[in-house]
Amino acid sequence: MKNTKIKETIERLHTQVNEFVDEGRYQDYLKFINKFWNRSAFNQLLIYMYKDKASYVMGYKQWIDKFNRIPVACIVCRAIAVKDCNCNERKAPVRIPQLAPMTYKKENELGEEEEKMFFRDVYVFDISDTEPIADLPVKEIVSLLEWVDVEIEDINLENKLIALINDKGFDFKYDDTGSDTLNGWTDYARKEIVVSNDRPKAQQIKTIVHEIGHMLAHDITTLGDMLAPRELKECEAESIAFVVLDTLGIDTSSYSVGYVAGWTNNEEDLLIDSIQTVSKNAKFILEYLQDSKPE
């Protein structure tokens, strides 16, 4: 039964997540997911668990139809009639499970049609486990974010980030923070983000993205966020900023993202919740920037 299979996949994810989210590998994971920023947090985790060197994944039929490539395995030899293939020399491709959302319509008790959602398990393959199909032209794979080749000084990036803040109902301003170490803050009561006016532009942009992370992910007016450790919230905001800036190709070599597992007491559910928070909000920011790209 497929539901059982999906449940087993999720259970495996929960039990293994602590194995890589340690002090040495968490930041590597954040760097890894920038290649898959538009996938769900669960699917990002699954790709990393099954093939942490993956760079571009797609389903079996998609590889064939879109890029004239095919996952390498013995069955492939038969499919494309390679008669002289020595199957013993071929390495089976890694089948990476993914949870694909599906929708259907069903009548409720009032006879009204409602849209329902369920998940089915599918498999994808990394490009490293594929090869071009003989006698067909090779098609180039273009990055989804090819247009965002930004510089940290780019005024358009700054304007888009400030527009995002305004669209979420917050004001933004540069001001004197009164401290050499305080780069900025998010004021939830006044619905305002303030960033230091005397920092280099690169630092200002990084701080803006960090504070947007707080704005989207945290709300001190709710009990859950009030009780959450400040260090965890800082780690989540810094993680969001790291994923966004790294995906945009902006230098993140100076970043030292905190130890998220330490602030969730290594509890799998809390740890995955935190990873989902980072993934969801980084994706929101990147989609906003992509949707507001200039014509």
Describe every region a protein language model picked out:
Residues 1-236, 240-295:
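N-terminal accessory/interface modules of nucleic-acid-binding and processing proteins
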